[in-house]
Amino acid sequence: MQSCRDVADLDDVLELSELPSGRSWNGAIAFLDRDGVLNIGSSDYVNNAAELIVIEGVAKAVGELRRGGYRICIVTNQSPIGRGFWDHECLADIHAELRRKLLEQDKDAILDLILYCPYAPWDNSECRK
């Protein structure tokens, strides 16, 4: 049971966009959770792109991290997939909307990588955080 990568296979080559102002990358990575950090979470889950509400100021914070030389990696548990509530494509739509909303507010708020664990807690997957 391994983790999954948004819109690509886990083993695919990761193509990174340039950091702002042509800054060189020194290997710094900011690992961020999604629900409750970037967007408002819900006990009933964020079930579709229309339900996604980005927390105020988050896009600027992500942009500032990138302007400071950090790559942004989102790590998130997404057990609704393992519970059968929705599929990987639904999650890809939610993540596309997250990316769109962040970039709408700050052109540098690029998410370099999103890793997620689709398994339910009782699956005892090591990829759950």
Set out the residue ranges of the language-model regions.
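Charge-dense, low-complexity intrinsically disordered segments
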Residues: 48, 52, 85-89, 129
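Non-cysteine beta-strand/loop elements that form the S-adenosyl-L-methionine
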Residues: 30-35, 113-117
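Short, charged, low-hydrophobicity "junction" segments
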Residues: 9-12, 42-43, 89
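Non-catalytic pre-domain segments flanking phosphatase-related domains
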Residues: 1-34
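Conserved hydrophobic residues forming the short capping helix/wall of the S-adenosyl-L-methionine
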Residues: 98-106
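Basic, amphipathic juxtamembrane/active-site segments
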Residues: 43-60
